[in-house]
From Swiss-Prot:
Similarity comment: family membership: Belongs to the myo-inositol 1-phosphate synthase family.
Protein name, as recorded: Inositol-3-phosphate synthase
Cofactors that this protein relies on: NAD(+)
Gene Ontology BP term (one): inositol biosynthetic process
Organism annotation: Zea mays (Maize)
């Protein structure tokens, strides 16, 4: 059964005029390695910690500024939100299609809230806590091309022509602000697009981005802004002592106009200095140590890296299943070809290397979780190939072969073919990232023994479900298994309204 909304009634939750306050018992374990009489053993001790959560319920008017607004992702997301807001329908070869938010965790998925008369009851994910309605988002952003969003949508060839015709009047006046362009960080083939760029030194470019954010906020009368990078994949930046290893060195490098400070890092610096959440949707190392240091010092949310939309999402599910079933993946070969501008940029070896690292690391935590299958240091052979084939456009083809060892020396091979409509998969993920980032800024918590409420750590692990290479605070384990990531996100939101985590025990029926 499906219900649209619900309210929690419990002595552990209070709905106030401005906040939801909850008291939550976090049950976990602590491990101790004991030595006694010349022998050692591991001891697992159950542990319960009381947390208090406080969530502001006033939903702000949200502005979203996209770096690379005129690209396939930016134009597709903007078009999709307008189509939903205006209730647009259009003819396809199969039917009359209504605008929707399919593919969005927050807008199109559900959570289990309990059972009633022997039937499980589900509610929208977005009903857990007050969230921004995506129809109300005000979009803006930057691009190195001055093409308006209507023409960008036409160039992208993602949406049906009938829909494009209806959306054009809404999008013709949307023109990106000039963007930061550094040909050393992206493929040379992107130079033909770069007709709208911010001139000056790196310090002047940061100052211009800050000015743009302030003017956008004032012009559109928005309460909050989230900035997200959906521009070209950059090459990796060198991380060096004295260059970008600390906050002070990174800011000094900007002042000295050091060539190795990337455009994406400049945008991130501007956002952090302005107190605006910044999310990196590409695989490059935007968040160099000095930038993470800066975000922590300023308590400003940062998240990334790289949208998890198609092939990698499947991989994070399948490898988790195999290892969890006691099956040993020994070879993972992933081949992709695509024909959009992302594919064109990735044809440059340095840009591809960023993507290869992002896509290859996704199985690491699953492999390390099972020492029965894998010796220390052992890892499946893992190869990722991406080729540019202009004809297929945005319809990326992903082919994977998984070879595994099974019972008594047997071999098992799984082969997948996945046609990933690249931008149509990425757009709702971008939507979820900005909505959850905004929500995160309204949640505070404190553990038993702490005097004051505080926000989540600025490095937003809560966004991990949506990214290929989750950014985590120093010393925090990286989790890539998709089911664990979703459970973490859902259970934190449940805790904010005093609900127990969904553990699927269903003891009442046992």
């Amino acid at each position: 059964m499906f219900i649209e909304s619900f309210r929690v009634e419990s002595p552990h939750v209070r709905y106030g005029p401005m906040e939801i306050e909850s008291e939550y018992r976090y049950d976990t374990t602590e491990l101790v390695h004991e030595g006694k009489d010349g022998a050692s053993r591991w001891v697992v001790r159950p542990k319960s910690v009381k947390y208090n959560f406080r969530t502001r319920t006033a939903v702000p008017k949200l502005g979203v500024m996209l770096v690379g607004w005129g690209g396939n992702n930016g134009s597709t997301l903007t078009a999709g939100v307008i189509a939903n807001r205006e209730g647009i329908s259009w003819a396809t070869k199969d039917k009359v299609q209504q605008a929707n938010y399919y593919g969005s965790l927050t807008q199109a998925s559900t959570i289990r809230v309990g059972s009633y008369n022997g039937e499980e009851i589900y509610a929208p994910f977005k009903s857990l806590l007050p969230m921004v309605n995506p129809d109300d988002i005000v979009f803006g952003g930057w691009d190195i091309s001055n093409m308006n969003l209507a023409d960008s949508m036409t160039r992208a060839k993602v949406l049906d022509i009938d829909l494009q015709k209806q959306l054009r009047p809404y999008m013709e006046s949307m023109v990106p602000l000039p963007g930061i362009y550094d040909p050393d960080f992206i493929a040379a083939n992107q130079g033909s697009r770069a007709n709208s760029v911010i001139k000056g030194t790196k310090k002047e470019q940061v100052e211009q981005i800050i000015k743009d954010i302030r003017e956008f906020k004032e012009k559109n009368k928005v309460d909050k802004i989230v900035v997200l990078w959906t521009a070209n994949t950059e090459r990796y930046s060198n991380v060096c002592a004295g260059l970008n290893d600390t906050m002070e060195n990174l800011l000094a490098s900007v002042d000295k106009n050091e060539a190795e400070v990337s455009p994406s890092t400049l945008y991130a610096i501007a956002c952090v200095m302005e107190g605006v959440p910044f999310i990196n949707g590409s695989p490059q190392n935007t968040f160099v140590p000095g930038l993470i240091d800066l975000a922590i010092k300023n308590n400003c949310l940062i998240g990334g890296d790289d949208f998890k939309s198609g092939q990698t999402k499947m991989k994070s599910v399948l490898v988790d299943f195999l290892v969890g079933a006691g099956i040993k993946p020994t070879s993972i070969v992933s081949y992709n070809h695509l024909g959009n501008n992302d594919g064109m940029n990735l044809s440059a070896p340095q840009a591809f290397r960023s993507k290869e690292i992002s896509k290859s690391n996704v199985v690491d935590d699953m492999v390390s979780s099972n020492a029965i299958l894998y010796e220390p240091g052992e890892h499946p052979d893992h190869v990722v190939v991406i080729k540019y084939v202009p004809y297929v456009g945005d319809s990326k083809r992903a082919m994977d072969e998984y070879t595994s060892e099974i019972f008594m020396g047997g071999k098992n091979t799984i082969v997948l073919h996945n046609t990933c409509e690249d931008s149509l998969l990425a757009a709702p993920i971008i939507l979820d990232l900005v909505l959850l980032a905004e929500l995160s800024t309204r949640i505070q918590l404190k553990a038993e023994g702490e005097d004051k409420f505080h926000s989540f750590h600025p490095v937003a692990t809560i966004l991990s479900y949506l990214t290929k290479a989750p950014l985590v605070p120093p010393g925090t384990p990286v989790v890539n298994a998709l089911a664990k990531q979703r459970a973490m996100l859902e259970n934190i939101m449940r805790a904010c309204v005093g609900l127990a985590p969904e553990n699927n025990m269903i003891l009442e029926y046992k």
